UniProtKB/Swiss-Prot annotation:
The gene is fmt. The lineage of its organism: Bacteria, Bacillati, Bacillota, Bacilli, Bacillales. Its EC number is 2.1.2.9. One of its GO terms (cellular component) is cytosol. One of its GO terms (molecular function) is methionyl-tRNA formyltransferase activity. Attaches a formyl group to the free amino group of methionyl-tRNA(fMet). The formyl group appears to play a dual role in the initiator identity of N-formylmethionyl-tRNA by promoting its recognition by IF2 and preventing the misappropriation of this tRNA by the elongation apparatus. Gene3D superfamilies: Formyl transferase, C-terminal domain, Formyl transferase, N-terminal domain. This is Methionyl-tRNA formyltransferase. It comes from Staphylococcus epidermidis (strain ATCC 35984 / DSM 28319 / BCRC 17069 / CCUG 31568 / BM 3577 / RP62A).
């Protein structure tokens, strides 16, 4: 049985780790340090750590893997293979070259498209109708190694980051399970990526979360989907932030971009930079919980029609 070091951090990684534990010998897990979460800043372990601890697998949590004591330990383990899935750090070249079978990554896009840390978000924001999982050999350059296997999946109009995250996490574990035998036997026919076709999905920044109402309704809809339920798109109303969780396109309604042109029982309808509008259905006003627009409107006394979102 192959000795595997697993490296990953968020929920996306847990399905891959659970599959590896069931099918192989995981000798160590490397994940990010515990972080403060929520208003009370409670120190919280990454999801991967919880899975590893449950199975009594040694866990290492370096702030930065390069030049750390943990790196020396990992190099001494004589592993057969390193598997990563959304780990969140680049691996030192010494570690990439240490295992007998190399290091592989489970990446949530159809490489060479969407290299980087936010491939699911960016694919939806860009209006892609398809994405997938790539199993690839790791090299020093980010997400640029040879492709071992790929599997695609449709992005439906109603999908958002949350639903695609769940679909892709299961798909990643399934594809890795099918692919691992050829990696372990060294019988796979990996193919180089075409760097000329590479696109990038950098981590989402705060400024990326703000809605530009001058964009088309389709682009705004994709932006809301591509950031929901995390980190969440937002706009401002009455100089207060308003988070936007779900919406749909209303054809043929126009007005000055960002203006509330109608407030129905269930939606706030906002003009955009195109001939169509956006109907907001689920929001989170500043200082309040996430709620349906229906519930929000029931507590609002003034008319919102004519107000401008910025």
């Amino acid at each position: 049985m192959s000795k595997i070091i697993f490296m990953g951090t968020p929920d996306f990684s847990t399905k891959v780790l659970e599959m590896l534990i069931a099918e192989h010998e995981v000798i160590a897990v490397v994940t990010q340090p515990d972080r403060p979460v929520g208003r009370k800043k409670v120190m919280t372990p990454p999801p991967v750590k919880r899975v590893a601890t449950k199975h009594q697998i040694p866990v290492y949590q370096p702030e930065k893997l390069k030049d750390s004591q943990e790196l020396d330990v990992l190099l001494s383990l004589e592993s057969d293979l390193i598997v990563t899935a959304a780990f969140g750090q680049l691996l030192p070249e010494s570690l990439l070259n240490a295992p007998k079978l190399g290091a592989i990554n489970v990446h949530a896009s159809l490489l060479p498209k969407y290299r980087g840390g936010a491939p699911i978000h960016q694919a939806i924001i860009d209006g892609e109708e398809e994405t997938g999982i790539t199993i690839m050999y790791m090299v020093k350059k980010l997400d640029a190694g040879n492709i071992i296997s790929q599997q695609s999946i449709r992005i439906e109009e109603e999908d958002n980051v949350g639903t695609m995250h769940d679909k892709l996490s299961f798909l990643g574990a399934e594809l890795l399970k099918k692919t691992l035998p050829s990696i372990i036997d060294n019988t796979n026919d990996s193919i180089p990526q075409d760097d000329a076709l590479a696109t990038f999905a950098s981590n989402i920044r705060r400024e990326d979360e703000r809605i530009d109402w001058n964009m088309s309704a389709q682009a705004i809809h994709n932006h809301i989907r591509g950031l929901s339920p995390w980190p969440v798109a937002y706009t401002t109303m009455n100089e207060k932030n308003l988070k936007l969780f779900s919406a749909f396109i209303v054809k043929g309604k126009k007005g000055n971009p960002g203006t509330i042109i109608e407030a129905t029982k269930h939606e706030l309808i906002i003009a955009t930079g195109s001939d169509d509008a956006i109907a907001l259905t689920e929001i989170q006003p500043a200082g309040k919980k996430r709620m349906k627009v229906t519930d929000y409107l029931s507590g609002v006394q003034e008319s919102l029609v004519g107000k401008v979102l910025l």
